[in-house]
Amino acid sequence: MSFGSEHYLCSSSSYRKVFGDGSRLSARLSGAGGAGGFRSQSLSRSNVASSAACSSASSLGLGLAYRRPPASDGLDLSQAAARTNEYKIIRTNEKEQLQGLNDRFAVFIEKVHQLETQNRALEAELAALRQRHAEPSRVGELFQRELRDLRAQLEEASSARSQALLERDGLAEEVQRLRARCEEESRGREGAERALKAQQRDVDGATLARLDLEKKVESLLDELAFVRQVHDEEVAELLATLQASSQAAAEVDVTVAKPDLTSALREIRAQYESLAAKNLQSAEEWYKSKFANLNEQAARSTEAIRASREEIHEYRRQLQARTIEIEGLRGANESLERQILELEERHSAEVAGYQDSIGQLENDLRNTKSEMARHLREYQDLLNVKMALDIEIAAYRKLLEGEETRFSTSGLSISGLNPLPNPSYLLPPRILSATTSKVSSTGLSLKKEEEEEEASKVASKKTSQIGESFEEILEETVISTKKTEKSNIEETTISSQKI
């Protein structure tokens, strides 16, 4: 009875040492990181060692209990039956405990399988995330290509805008030059009109002078006719007087005085006729010269008027052409200004759209990074849970191996005692064969435990390396996003300054 109580206390204390409270152990294992996992592993090793020591002590107690020498030389059958009953009770209790442990072990194995499937799914998701994180270079290349295209379009728009501004400046200069020329032509037209008015005044004066001269010619002709008439009358009177005087003198001396008087009258008449002819000729020459001068002045005036009219007509035609050209240039300038305003509005709208798309991409990138960090944390937690379960499984394995060794040692100690009447009911042959096979596999299980410990160490190192690499990747992505944001801000400021 002392053996059963001792075995029960050792088994329960070893179970509590190894597992304790399930919630506390799972909280410690899930809350701790890589170093916590190693601490829990060392704790489980110490607990397993203590449980193994306890089981070995119980088995030694069993052996001592069975090997304790009796008071007499022979062993009583009643004591052997009591001991076998006690051993059966202990075995049934141990079987129940092992059944419960096997059930828990099966549950844990199923949970481990589920966690392994989740781990594989998370590894696939992590590989996809790594591939996606490796693909941001391609996404970044597409983004950079789109940015280059947008920058090229922006440069083309800015060059077109600068070209339009240059054309507008050239057209403005041409308009100013045409306006100056138009003003100059208008001033020339005004001067020509003033000269035309002056020429018209001169023509009016010339016509008035011609009319005056014509009147003077008519008056002179009338005067000449009057002078001729007076001259004829005087000649007639003189002839009459001469005839009278000749008749009077004839009476005195007809023969001597008559030839002298006729010759004198003839001379006087010739002198008057020559004087009248000279006066008429000089008057006609003066009239002809004056009329020719007036005609020449009138012809010059009419020619100047005609040239002035033609020049005025040409100036008017040029003015109309320049006005039409100015209107066309003004319309072209207004259309270019409208195009510039439309280009500026379109450019501002495109810049706003690109900034919105950049902000959306940055938000998507941040969400992707946070999702990657969350998946990595979940993966780390699952790795920690897997390591904790591996440690717990190793502890169960050590506990089972300790029980197997205890059973094997107890079987050996029982076989070393005096032979019982019927020892076949003490331990079934199936259990004995299982214990012997399990005892033979203890060395292999120890090797497997060492390999699992090394694998857990490698897994913890890999997880730490994955965490470090992920942190480096996060830092690189944050730095790259900051650089792209700075470059985008600088480009927008430069484009706004250019505008």
From Swiss-Prot:
Which UniProt keywords are listed?
Answer: Acetylation, Coiled coil, Developmental protein, Differentiation, Glycoprotein, Intermediate filament, Neurogenesis, Phosphoprotein
User: Which portions of the sequence form the region Head?
Assistant: 1-87
Q: Which Gene3D superfamilies match?
A: 1.20.5.170, Single helix bin, Vasodilator-stimulated phosphoprotein
Q: Where is the signal peptide?
A: none
Residues carrying N6-acetyllysine? 290
For region Linker 1, the annotated ranges are 130-142
**Which residue intervals make up region (Coil 1A)?**
88-129
Query: What is a single Pfam family found in this protein's UniProt entry?
Result: Filament
An example of a Gene Ontology cellular component annotation for this protein is:
Schaffer collateral - CA1 synapse
BP term (GO), one: intermediate filament organization
Tissue and organ distribution: Found predominantly in adult CNS.
* Modification(s) after translation: O-glycosylated.
List, in alphabetical order, the Gene Ontology terms for molecular function in this entry.
structural constituent of cytoskeleton; structural constituent of postsynaptic intermediate filament cytoskeleton
Protein biosynthesis among keywords: no
| UniProt-reported outcome of changing residue 110 to Q | In a breast cancer sample; somatic mutation
**Where is the region Linker 2?**
239-262
Region annotation Tail: where it falls in the sequence: 409-499
Q: Where is this region: Coil 1B?
A: 143-238
Q: What does this protein do?
A: Class-IV neuronal intermediate filament that is able to self-assemble. It is involved in the morphogenesis of neurons. It may form an independent structural network without the involvement of other neurofilaments or it may cooperate with NEFL to form the filamentous backbone to which NEFM and NEFH attach to form the cross-bridges. May also cooperate with the neuronal intermediate filament protein PRPH to form filamentous networks.
Tell me the protein's name: Alpha-internexin
Native organism: Homo sapiens
